[in-house]
From Swiss-Prot:
Function noted in UniProt: Plasmin dissolves the fibrin of blood clots and acts as a proteolytic factor in a variety of other processes including embryonic development, tissue remodeling, tumor invasion, and inflammation. In ovulation, weakens the walls of the Graafian follicle. It activates the urokinase-type plasminogen activator, collagenases and several complement zymogens, such as C1, C4 and C5. Cleavage of fibronectin and laminin leads to cell detachment and apoptosis. Also cleaves fibrin, thrombospondin and von Willebrand factor. Its role in tissue remodeling and tumor invasion may be modulated by CSPG4.
Annotated organism of origin: Mus musculus (Mouse)
Chain's gene name: Plg
Post-translational changes noted in the entry: In the presence of the inhibitor, the activation involves only cleavage after Arg-581, yielding two chains held together by two disulfide bonds. In the absence of the inhibitor, the activation involves additionally the removal of the activation peptide.
Highest classification ranks of the organism: Eukaryota, Metazoa, Chordata, Craniata, Vertebrata
Name listed for the protein in its UniProt record: Plasminogen
Description of how activity is regulated: Converted into plasmin by plasminogen activators, both plasminogen and its activator being bound to fibrin. Cannot be activated with streptokinase.
Matches recorded under SUPFAM superfamilies: Hairpin loop containing domain-like (SSF57414), Kringle-like (SSF57440), Trypsin-like serine proteases (SSF50494)
Note: Plasmin is inactivated by alpha-2-antiplasmin immediately after dissociation from the clot. In the presence of the inhibitor, the activation involves only cleavage after Arg-581, resulting in 2 chains held together by 2 disulfide bonds. Without the inhibitor, the activation also involves removal of the activation peptide.
Length: 812
């Protein structure tokens, strides 16, 4: 099930009023804790588990896990700080926040962390010990104060905070250096602030992060799971000097929040380096010259460039002298320059030579996203799969196998040298039912990958249909197959993938159950013992088994064949997806972007603009491309081409029958072709986005075109470039496009320059990968120059015009 379905099922398992209680827990799907002190109990839902954990008296319950299909609860004394985690299907682990936290709130009487040394570095005496000091406070005299081991605590509400008896015979007790939780104050620039302040400095209410009104934006909580973008609380997801929020005032897009700095010393910093590691956010060397040889401006000065990247605003970023630094999450260290004509530039920092161990893997730089659309498939259980897919079945990005963040694990290249654990590619190192990976979402430990098993004959993949092709009724019993995750599957398969017959849904032998029965789920098709998916499990239909030792297992239901040979957004040739340039030349694999068209004058045949095929009869382009003439017969469209000047057998040439300009003078236009294009493996439409969909900040997208290459190689052949989307809030900063970008536009580009769409690429596509297909998110519109540093390209935001596009296609 996708994230929304998981949340829905989760909420259904709660009783009224339990949501607030769970705020004190951190949940992780697919994670099970190895525990020695535990109780296994029957439970009807998460709320029952919660009550059992809170009411446990035999031991301190720090976590519990709920197994929905087993209707079982396991309450445990351990948590992920003290015990190892294993991956498991159909389980959600809940851990009490207070036992995971290493900070204090107020005077710290609720602190339950594991600090066990005093401010002076002396080890603490165990609270239950009587040597070298006989305690006044012990576990027996104060059983509710968390006096475990030798951890710092505050059982007497001391105003100076947590303390402990020391192991120094001459020092009875001393205080501990526990940092404040960033709830009512912030350290550094508030990157880790987790409080509930939700008003700006001027008193405006904050807009909820998951809302797109009144301000549409790209800081989507699901795309930034580690940024804690909850409710409408002030946060700092993008390297600003302090937390901020979008406001509920339509005339004020965003504003900083007034959050005080914490008064206690900040948590210990991460290791620092004299060389480049990752993005260089922990670089503390003394390079003070940019890549082009410009001397850096001092961070504390405001000439020749005024800025807010000051030592005062970024107190933890070591903005000393004029040394190159990366205070705001750029791709590398940089500095403002002393040249008044060049505001800032990256620096060239020598790379650290020693390779990181798995524990030291830099999680700040995720690997390049590998998103094969030409459907790779796997044989058998996928242990031999060595493809490059790195996307899960719900569209989440995979964590690198060598990384330990956000999920620590033992499935490393060192431990499984023959499993092909490269980068973050989907693999099956442990003989599971198919390739899987750990995810980059802290709340979802792992998922199976968005891959399909190769068919028994021919090795090809049975394609999944588009939404419009899904049947509304039950599957045809003669073609026992499923669509999507099989939630609507009504076939008659009644055996698991392992060959075990299914137990009837109404039966209570050999397994008793009460959640998934014909009575509790009358619309789920729980007939006889047929495989079904009543809970929307992402892994597909399942059943309780007739094996007394195996409660449930999944069924092997094939995907239904698509009614169409080619689906939108799915090329039949895998794109190169190189991080190279259009300017500078990165020649695309022929026909790997099959929606790309060349717009030409009908009489000279000269290419002058790009465009995107969005339906057999329709092309989307930029309105400014049609300034040459208002007559449709002036234009023609070339489809299926790779070479600009060479006509292959697969090239289609179609004249234009109608021009439709956007009525509010936005830079977007529709071309109706004089006849439908023939859809082939070399001519396939791109998919349109959902109306008003917002592309998340830093999403990797792709531009293509035959445009200006400024004398570099590759001219005349279709080129491509990989670009990150830049949130409009960032793009409109004074050092970039200075408030020129409208809400109906989006920015994308490498701020260092060198990668951009240029003259001749106008009107062409900017497509972004989403789960299993490419979506047309932008139409190339304008820019300040071509591939200039600090001047990203600007694209019409297609999602804002989907209603208009669909209406015009219907009416014409």
């Amino acid at each position: 099930m996708d994230h929304k379905e998981v949340i829905l099922l989760f909420l259904l398992l709660l009783k009224p009023g339990q949501g607030d209680s769970l705020d004190g827990y951190i949940s992780t799907q697919g994670a099970s804790l190895f525990s020695l002190t535990k109780k296994q109990l029957a439970a009807g839902g998460v709320s029952d588990c919660l009550a059992k954990c809170e009411g446990e008296t035999d031991f301190v319950c720090r976590s519990f896990q709920y197994h929905s299909k087993e209707q079982q609860c396991v309450i445990m004394a351990e948590n992920s700080k003290t015990s190892s985690i294993i991956r498991m299907r159909d389980v959600i682990l809940f851990e009490k926040r207070v036992y995971l936290s290493e900070c204090k709130t107020g005077i710290g009487n609720g602190y339950r962390g594991t600090m066990s040394r005093t401010k002076s570095g002396v080890a603490c005496q165990k609270w239950g010990a009587t040597f070298p000091h006989v305690p006044n406070y012990s576990p027996s005299t104060h059983p509710n104060e968390g006096l475990e081991e030798n951890y710092c605590r505050n059982p007497d509400n001391d105003e100076q905070g947590p303390w402990c008896y020391t192991t120094d015979p001459d020092k009875r007790y001393d205080y501990c250096n526990i940092p404040e939780c960033e709830e009512e104050c912030m350290y550094c620039s508030g990157e880790k602030y987790e409080g509930k302040i939700s008003k700006t400095m001027s008193g405006l209410d904050c807009q909820a992060w998951d809302s797109q009104s009144p301000h549409a934006h790209g800081y989507i909580p699901a795309k930034f799971p580690s940024k804690n973008l909850k409710m409408n609380y002030c946060r700092n997801p993008d390297g600003e000097p302090r937390p901020w929020c979008f406001t509920t005032d339509p005339t004020k897009r965003w504003e900083y929040c007034d959050i005080p700095r914490c008064t206690t010393p900040p948590p210990p910093p991460s290791p620092t380096y004299q060389c480049l590691k990752g993005r260089g956010e922990n670089y503390r060397g003394t390079v003070s010259v940019t890549v082009s040889g410009k001397t850096c401006q001092r961070w504390s000065e405001q000439t020749p460039h005024r800025h807010n990247r000051t030592p005062e605003n970024f107190p933890c970023k070591n903005l000393e002298e004029n040394y190159c630094r990366n205070p705001d999450g750029e791709t590398a260290p940089w500095c403002y320059t002393t040249d008044s004509q060049l505001r800032w530039e990256y620096c060239e920092i020598p790379s650290c030579e020693s390779s990181a161990s798995p524990d030291q893997s830099d999680s700040s730089v995720p690997p390049e996203e590998q998103t094969p659309v030409v459907q790779e498939c796997y044989q058998s259980d996928g242990q031999s799969y060595r493809g490059t897919s790195s996307t899960t079945i719900t569209g989440k990005k995979c964590q690198s196998w060598a990384a330990m963040f956000p999920h620590r694990h033992s499935k490393t290249p060192e431990n499984f040298p023959d499993a092909g654990l490269e980068m973050n590619y989907c693999r099956n190192p442990d003989g599971d039912k198919g390739p899987w990976c750990y995810t980059t979402d802290p709340s979802v430990r792992w998922e199976y990958c968005n891959l399909k098993r190769c068919s028994e004959t021919g090795g090809s993949v049975v394609e999944l249909p588009t939404v419009s092709q899904e049947p509304s009724g039950p599957s045809d019993s003669e073609t026992d197959c499923m669509y999507g995750n099989g939630k609507d599957y009504r076939g008659k398969t009644a055996v698991t993938a392992a060959g075990t017959p299914c137990q009837g849904w109404a039966a209570q032998e050999p397994h008793r159950h009460s959640i998934f029965t014909p009575q509790t789920n009358p619309r789920a098709g729980l007939e006889k013992n047929y495989c079904r998916n009543p809970d929307g499990d992402v892994n597909g239909p399942w059943c309780y088994t007739t094996n007394p030792r195996k409660l449930y297992d999944y069924c092997d239901i094939p995907l239904c064949a698509s009614a169409s040979s080619f689906e939108c957004g799915k090329p039949q040739v895998e794109p190169k997806k190189c991080p190279g340039r259009v300017v500078g030349g990165c020649v695309a694999n022929p026909h790997s972007w099959p929606w790309q068209i060349s717009l030409r004058t009908r009489f000279t045949g000269q290419h002058f603009c790009g465009g995107t095929l969005i339906a057999p009869e329709w092309v989307l382009t930029a309105a400014h491309c049609l300034e040459k003439s208002s007559r449709p017969e002036f234009y023609k469209v070339i489809l299926g081409a790779h070479e600009e000047y060479i006509r292959g057998l697969d090239v289609q040439e179609i004249s234009v029958a109608k021009l439709i300009l956007e009525p509010n003078n936005r830079d977007i236009a529709l071309l109706k072709l004089s006849r439908p294009a023939t859809i082939t493996d070399k001519v396939i439409p791109a998919c349109l986005p959902s109306p008003n969909y917002m592309v998340a900040d830093r999403t990797i997208c792709y531009i293509t075109g035959w445009g200006e290459t400024q004398g570099t190689f590759g001219a005349g052949r279709l080129k491509e470039a990989q670009l990150p989307v830049i949130e409009n809030k960032v793009c409109n900063r004074v050092e970039y496009l200075n408030n020129r970008v409208k809400s109906t536009e989006l920015c994308a580009g490498q701020l260092a320059g060198g990668v951009d769409s240029c003259q001749g690429d106008s009107g062409g596509p900017l497509v972004c990968f989403e789960k299993d297909k490419y979506i047309l998110q932008g139409v190339t519109s304008w820019g300040l120059g071509c591939a200039r540093p600090n001047k990203p390209g600007v694209y019409v935001r297609v999602s804002r015009f989907v209603d208009w596009i669909e209406r015009e296609m219907r009416n014409n």
